[in-house]
């Protein structure tokens, strides 16, 4: 049986789950990555980590900093450096909007997911976010616990 044509197929490689806890997500966007061949092969083997990474604006371009893509095991002397800077491919309009938000409002750009889209291209889901304070994190956790408790009560009653 064939898949429906309109459903996007995303093979998620890495997810930054702590970002939703540590930051208040205000807006998301999709960005491409400039990768080498061994990086793509390593990603296809589901090996990467974006938990400690962030995006920064330098020399008129956005760069992904501190992302980890391990060396490809079958790679030879042309293998890549695991923690190198990776250029993000974003439209100029998005880039200027992100730059203005980051420089003026004290926000940051954090990666949420790294995945292959339906055409096999590596994409990064970025979020424009504001850091949460400790009391905000506690409040979010209380709301989440209360929602779970409500769902449990409704399930047990009904």
Swiss-Prot record:
Residues 136-158 have a biased composition (Basic and acidic residues). GO terms for molecular function: RNA binding. CDD domains: SmpB. Keywords: Cytoplasm, RNA-binding. Transmembrane segments: none annotated. GO terms for biological process: trans-translation. Its main location: cytoplasm. The keyword RNA-binding applies. Residues 132-158 are annotated as: Disordered. It is found in: Cytoplasm. Pfam families: SmpB. InterPro entries: SmpB, SsrA-bd_prot, SsrA-bd_prot_CS. The keyword RNA-binding applies. GO terms for cellular component: cytosol. Belongs to the SmpB family. Required for rescue of stalled ribosomes mediated by trans-translation. Binds to transfer-messenger RNA (tmRNA), required for stable association of tmRNA with ribosomes. tmRNA and SmpB together mimic tRNA shape, replacing the anticodon stem-loop with SmpB. tmRNA is encoded by the ssrA gene; the 2 termini fold to resemble tRNA(Ala) and it encodes a 'tag peptide', a short internal open reading frame. During trans-translation Ala-aminoacylated tmRNA acts like a tRNA, entering the A-site of stalled ribosomes, displacing the stalled mRNA. This is SsrA-binding protein. It comes from Brucella anthropi (strain ATCC 49188 / DSM 6882 / CCUG 24695 / JCM 21032 / LMG 3331 / NBRC 15819 / NCTC 12168 / Alc 37). The lineage of its organism: Bacteria, Pseudomonadati, Pseudomonadota, Alphaproteobacteria, Hyphomicrobiales.
């Amino acid at each position: 049986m064939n898949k429906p044509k309109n459903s996007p197929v995303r093979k998620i490689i890495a997810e930054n789950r702590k970002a939703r806890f540590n930051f208040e997500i205000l807006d998301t966007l999709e960005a491409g990555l400039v990768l080498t061949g061994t990086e793509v092969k390593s990603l296809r083997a589901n090996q990467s980590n974006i938990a400690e990474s962030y995006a920064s604006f330098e020399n008129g371009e956005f760069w992904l900093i501190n992302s980890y893509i391990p060396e490809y095991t079958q790679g030879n002397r042309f293998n890549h450096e695991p923690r190198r800077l990776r250029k993000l491919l974003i439209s100029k309009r998005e880039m200027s909007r992100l730059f203005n938000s980051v420089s003026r409002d004290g926000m940051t750009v954090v990666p949420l997911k790294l995945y292959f889209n339906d055409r096999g291209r590596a994409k990064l889901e970025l979020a424009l976010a504001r850091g949460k304070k400790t009391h905000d994190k506690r409040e979010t956790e209380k709301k989440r616990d209360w929602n779970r408790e409500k769902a449990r009560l409704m399930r047990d009653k009904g």
